[in-house]
Each structure stands twice: as C-alpha cells, then as structure tokens.
Amino acid sequence: MAKSVAIGIDLGTTYSCVGVFQHGKVEIIANDQGNRTTPSSVAFTDTERLIGDAAKNQVALNPQNTVFDAKRLIGRKFGDPVVQGDMKHWPFRVINDGDKPKVQVSYKGETKGFYPEEISSMVLTKMKEIAEGYLGHPVSNAVITVPAYFNDSQRQATKDAGVIAGLNVLRIINEPTAAAIAYGLDRTGKGERNVLIFDLGGGTFDVSILTIDDGIFEVKATAGDTHLGGEDFDNRLVNHFVEEFKRKHKKDYSQNKRAVRRLRTACERAKRTLSSSTQASLEIDSLFEGIDFYTSITRARFEELCSDLFRSTLEPVEKALRDAKLDKAQIHDLVLVGGSTRIPKVQKLLQDFFNGRDLNKSINPDEAVAYGAAVQAAILMGDKSENVQDLLLLDVAPLSLGLETAGGVMTALIKRNSTIPTKQTQIFTTYSDNQPGVLIQVYEGERAMTRDNNLLGRFELSGIPPAPRGVPQIEVTFDIDANGILNVTATDKSTGKANKITITNDKGRLSKEEIERMVQEAEKYKAEDEIQRERVGAKNALESYAFNMKSVVEDEGLKGKISEADKKKVLDKCQEVISWLDANTLAEKDEFEHKRKELEQVCNPIISGLYQGAGGPGPGGFGAPDLKGGSGSGPTIEEVD
C-alpha cells in the first residue's frame, strides 16, 4: 500500500467535494459520474440505498424517502425554530426523539429513523469511496470542513459523522479558512495582505477576514449565518410559482410532495440560468392534475423576490470588519467562495459595499474549500512539500464561551474571535455560606444573560469544605482544541478536588454507545448495498446473455448452419428465461446465476458446434448487443425534471 495519505472533505449542505494533496499539488477527485462535486443526498428505496447523484436523480419519484440538507439539522435540537421552519419545506419526515431531530423514511419496506449524523456519515462514506477509487487503496485519515459559524454541538456532531463513516478525523476546520488556503497557497511573497472570504453556499453563509503573510494564515474575525444559502433562494422561487399556479389555475399543489419536488428542481435550474441570462423559462409537463406549467421569470424579478436575503449578506461583512478592527479600505482582496456567489446581484452588492472594488474570482467557488482541506490534511500528516511545509493556520473561536454566575449572568472566559487552540483560567467562589458544591454551567453566545445564550453542558464540583461565602477558591479552566471543541475543568484549590467535562455530553450529542452502534449499522448498510450491486450485476448478466443467444441463433447469416430443432431449443429456453426474469426481478444473486448455468447448458453445445462447423474461433463472451426489451428487463427510464 502507498504511504498513508489523508483527504480533505468539504461536507456541504447541498453538494460535497473531496480532494487529496499528493506530488506537491491538490487533485479534486471526480465521482463515478465524472462530477467533481457530489449531491449530499441519500435515498432509501424498497430494494436499496442510493447516495449522491443516484439519489438526487430519482428524487422526483421518491421525494419522501430522499434525504438532503442533513447539515441544516446536524447538532441542532428538534425544538430549534430553524428546524421547525425548515420542516415546512422538506418532503421527508422529521420526528422528535428526546428533542433530537430524526429523519423517518421507508427502507426495504420498513420504517427506519436516522439521526442527521448518520445521514451525513453516509455522504462522508461516499466521499471516502470516491477518493479510494481514485487512489487505489483504502483511506481513513481526513480533514472535514464546517461553516466558521458552526457552534460547538454542530462541530462535535460533524466529527461524530466522520467516526460513523469509519474516518479518523484529523481536524475539523472552518470552510472560509480552507478557502483562504486555496487562495493564498500560490500567492506567497507578496507581503502581508488582508483577505476577506465571502462564502455563500447551498445552506450556510460565512465571512472571514484573514491576514496572509508568507505562509501564515491568521484569521482576524469571522461572522455569518448558519442558515442562509442557495436553498433559501430556491424556496422563494418555489413559493412564487406556487402562487402563480394558484392565480392561473385556481389550484394549490403545495401539499403534493412530488409536484413541489419537480418544481424545486426546475427552480434550481432557472436560478442557475439567471446567473448568465436575464430570463429563464420553466417547462414542467403535467405538474399537477394533468396541467402543464409553462412559465418564465426575469433576473430582475428573482432579485426582487430575494432582495432582503441578498442584502442580509452585508451585515456579517460589517460585523467581521468591526471585529477585525479594519476599515473596508484596508482589505486587499475580496474572494468569492460557494456556488451562490455566482449570482450577479450578490456580487454587485458586495462590490458596491466596497466602493466598486474588483472581486477576486480566481479560485473555483465549488472546489476551493475541499482544496484547502486537502492541503491541511497533508500538513497534519507531515507532508514536506516545499509549498506547504511552512504553512501555518491560526483560526479563531466563532462565539464567546463562558459560564453562568449569580443572577444568570454570562461571564465569558474566552471571547469570540480568540485564536485557537487557547486556554483561559479564572477563579470563582461560592455564593452562600457553607455551600457544599458548585454547579458549573457552560454557555456559548454573545448576550449578557445566559438564558439568551446556548447551554453547552453542565457539571457539579461537590465536596467543598464548609466555609463562609467568598472564601473557597474554585479555579475554572476553559481549553479549546484546534477543532474548536471545548474542555472545561474546575478545581477546588483547598482540596485539589477536580472535575472536568468535554462538552460532549451536551444534550444534543450522541453517546459513545450510540456512535458505536451507528458505526456497526453503517458497515451493515454498506454490506447490503454491495449485495444489491452484485444481485443487479447477476440479473443484468443473465438478461444480456439470454438476448445475446436469441440474436445469435436468429442471425440471418447462420441460416442453414443450425438445425431448426436446435434453433427452437435455444429460442424456447431463452424465452423461458426472459419470462422468468420478468416475473422474478427481485430474485437473489445465486438464482440468477443458477438460471444462467441452465441456459448455458442448453446453448453452449449448440453454439460451439456452430462455430466449429463454420471453422471460426468461438465467440468468447459475445459483445452483448444491448437488446433491452419488455418490462422488468433493463432499467425503465423516466425523465426527472
């Protein structure tokens, strides 16, 4: 096996991408369809599980069992208003499991529930397989990216998804920081530059300001919205056309999942068209109750429908500039990342905000994040290529971290935009006389009161010797590692008694046992997928062999060289097999193979006799002419629009 390499995975809301750094450069790896990005979708059918393009391609036929947007659920509570709002747009069911959201689907005739981590792990497994196919050997080490504005629970849940997928997650890094590496890697030696990364993807939005100076990438500030992206623009278009259909045809199909799914696919296509044309047309045959829906939309109308969303991208830009204590004139480069930055209006708003400055479009907005992640993966594996060995990444914590003190006040130990890894210690004391213990409640957020912030976890430090209030000294240490994941320790200085928490037993987190179980299930699903692939392979082989034999004996050129009795024998047996195939499309692999042997026993003696008689070499495996006919023989294709 080759020396161990590590891959970089951009796990996106709508699309994911994987890269590897080898021989001094990054390769973005194409999937089996030849695409360099893969849809972050997983579909469950009566017979199999599909991931990526295969899942997205059948979504109109199977909307309620095709899961996407797991990134909008991961690390969130079921009661989160964001989750509740999103559920209105999703065709699949999300259920409440102890305030953790769970996706419910029908798979192989059974109702199954999956946590967002499991769905994301399936996408990660797919990306891992794409890389393994390209490299030709197993891969286990990976760097996975997350939005810079992801909080602790979202980061931890993403890391868990990697573990379930059988990956050793070397590091979780921020998407804009990864993109900055892609941008700055070949631009060394130009002196210090302040770079603003504007990353607007399918579901999340980040702004990061970095200083790049001779291989040192230092993040100065980060801001964003973990719930803004291309999907939200699609939603506006969908709502617009649902209303238009109501006006024109007096019918409402907003509850018909298949119709809405077909409309959404058309809207996504129209949105992309509007980045290069000023008008796009939608043509959907028999959208609802047999009515064809032919309509069009102009770029101006699209911009008007999304104007508030587009404008809202500038608030994080202002916030990041304030936090970095920079004036907009001090930014040297404005770098666009994420597919949604192709929208002309988004570019214009950013350009106008920076007084007409040119935007830098030199990196591929879809691939930059995976590119940077692949570089970081190589560095963590100790790659000594000259262009990466001196590279240093200094990232920041996106949100302030602290604990609750008397009266529900948030006391921050680590301020937002502190460079990580970092460690801060502070002394606290008791609030009442002879208090036997203290409850340490850890929060993240920017508000003054803890009730407005996000509770990450809590633990008790007990056994404090009786003493008047204010006497005991409790030393609390917050320690953030390079993944942006927090450890908190509390020590009673008088007794040396300590207690610690890695914020992993946050209520939304999966326990070690659950992760173990999911790892085993992931293996099981993978094995089932393999069996299904082999089954289909055996079925197709039998089918093409039967049609092949049929066409060989019916060949006009063989007239007179084969007796009618033999010809009838072969044709009857072929017909019998083809009829059996039609009736048994779900048979097992060995049944298909057994049928093939039966057929070969009839055909082989006749066919080989034929070729010996003709003096020609045997036909070997015959170049199967693909004569797929009849129902059940060969795939039945339906246009998905």
Curated annotation (Swiss-Prot):
Where are residues bearing Phosphothreonine located in the sequence?
A: T636
Keyword Nucleotide-binding listed: yes
Which molecular-function annotation in GO is an example for this chain? heat shock protein binding
Where in this protein does the record say N-acetylalanine is found? Answer: A2
Biological processes per GO annotation: chaperone cofactor-dependent protein refolding; lysosomal transport; negative regulation of transcription by RNA polymerase II; positive regulation of microtubule nucleation; positive regulation of proteasomal ubiquitin-dependent protein catabolic process; protein refolding; regulation of mitotic spindle assembly
**Where does the protein end up?**
Cytoplasm; Nucleus; Cytoplasm, Cytoskeleton, Microtubule organizing center, Centrosome; Secreted
Q: Name one GO cellular component term.
A: plasma membrane
Biased region (Gly residues) positions are: 614-633
Chain residues that bind ATP? 12-15, 71, 202-204, 268-275, 339-342
Q: How does it assemble?
A: Component of the CatSper complex. Identified in a IGF2BP1-dependent mRNP granule complex containing untranslated mRNAs. Identified in a IGF2BP1-dependent mRNP granule complex containing untranslated mRNAs. Interacts with CHCHD3, DNAJC7, IRAK1BP1, PPP5C and TSC2. Interacts with TERT; the interaction occurs in the absence of the RNA component, TERC, and dissociates once the TERT complex has formed. Interacts with TRIM5 (via B30.2/SPRY domain). Interacts with METTL21A. Interacts with DNAAF2. Interacts with PRKN. Interacts with FOXP3. Interacts with NOD2; the interaction enhances NOD2 stability.
Name the protein family.
Belongs to the heat shock protein 70 family.
Family annotation (InterPro entries): ATPase_NBD, Heat_shock_70_CS, HSP70_C_sf, HSP70_peptide-bd_sf, Hsp_70_fam
PROSITE patterns in UniProt: HSP70_1 (PS00297), HSP70_2 (PS00329), HSP70_3 (PS01036)
Q: Which residue positions does the secretion signal occupy?
A: none
What name appears for this protein in its UniProt entry? Answer: Heat shock 70 kDa protein 1A
NCBIfam families from the xrefs?
Answer: PRK00290.1 (NF001413)
Q: Does the keyword 4Fe-4S apply?
A: no
PTM N6-acetyllysine: at which residues? K77, K108, K246, K348
Omega-N-methylarginine PTM sites in chain numbering: R469
Function, as annotated, reads: Molecular chaperone implicated in a wide variety of cellular processes, including protection of the proteome from stress, folding and transport of newly synthesized polypeptides, activation of proteolysis of misfolded proteins and the formation and dissociation of protein complexes. Plays a pivotal role in the protein quality control system, ensuring the correct folding of proteins, the re-folding of misfolded proteins and controlling the targeting of proteins for subsequent degradation. This is achieved through cycles of ATP binding, ATP hydrolysis and ADP release, mediated by co-chaperones.
Q: Which residues carry this modification: N6,N6-dimethyllysine?
A: K561
Q: Per UniProt, which keywords does this protein have? A: Acetylation, ATP-binding, Chaperone, Cytoplasm, Cytoskeleton, Methylation, Nucleotide-binding, Nucleus, Phosphoprotein, Secreted, Stress response
Phosphoserine PTM positions: S631, S633
Ranges for region Nucleotide-binding domain (NBD): 2-386
Biological source species: Sus scrofa
Region of interest (Disordered), residue spans: 614-641
